[in-house]
Amino acid sequence: MFRRPALQVLRQFVRHESEIASSLVLERSLNRVQLLGRVGQDPVMRQVEGKNPVTIFSLATNEMWRSGDNETYQMGDVSQKTTWHRISVFRPGLRDVAYQYVKKGSRIYVEGKVDYGEYMDKNNVRRQATTIIADNIVFLSDQTKEKA
């Protein structure tokens, strides 16, 4: 029942070259991130010479859990961990909308991919940076309306 649709989906992701030419299999991979959280700072737009501008902001996601064994789990202490993510928006239309409407404290949903890059800081030291390249942003709250 589910076998045929699964095979059709897999065929979209795996491409085979001719068996005569080569036995090399070219396969697609997936780099996808979904985040739901609150904006930590108003976005900034930066432009490096010779490159397209980028809108950058931080997004906080929270993870909560209860500590304790099975008997006291319901009564255990609640612990929380906040993880901060650097969000970069390069797509021209989305970049401008994010710069204009994303505000500190807003609750948003971001879809994108993880990117690990390197850059030289102002002291000429090579640094590594992890960022989420946003493909889609969904605004779930307007911070100005929440304060009213």
Curated annotation (Swiss-Prot):
Its main location: mitochondrion. One of its GO terms (biological process) is mitochondrial DNA replication. One of its GO terms (molecular function) is chromatin binding. The modification N6-acetyllysine is found at residue 113. PROSITE patterns: SSB. InterPro entries: NA-bd_OB-fold (IPR012340), Primosome_PriB/ssb (IPR000424), ssDNA-bd (IPR011344). Pfam families: SSB. Residues 1-16 form a transit peptide. CDD domains: SSB_OBF (cd04496). It is found in: Mitochondrion; Mitochondrion matrix, Mitochondrion nucleoid. Residues 30-141 form the SSB domain. The keyword DNA-binding applies. The modification N6-succinyllysine is found at residue 122. The modification Phosphoserine is found at residues 67, 79. NCBIfam families: ssb. Homotetramer. Interacts with MPG/AAG, through inhibition of its glycosylase activity it potentially prevents formation of DNA breaks in ssDNA, ensuring that base removal primarily occurs in dsDNA. Interacts with POLDIP2. Interacts with PRIMPOL. PANTHER family: SINGLE-STRANDED DNA-BINDING PROTEIN, SINGLE-STRANDED DNA-BINDING PROTEIN, MITOCHONDRIAL. Binds preferentially and cooperatively to pyrimidine rich single-stranded DNA (ss-DNA). In vitro, required to maintain the copy number of mitochondrial DNA (mtDNA) and plays a crucial role during mtDNA replication by stimulating the activity of the replisome components POLG and TWNK at the replication fork. Promotes the activity of the gamma complex polymerase POLG, largely by organizing the template DNA and eliminating secondary structures to favor ss-DNA conformations that facilitate POLG activity. In addition it is able to promote the 5'-3' unwinding activity of the mtDNA helicase TWNK. This is Single-stranded DNA-binding protein, mitochondrial. The lineage of its organism: Eukaryota, Metazoa, Chordata, Craniata, Vertebrata. The gene is SSBP1.
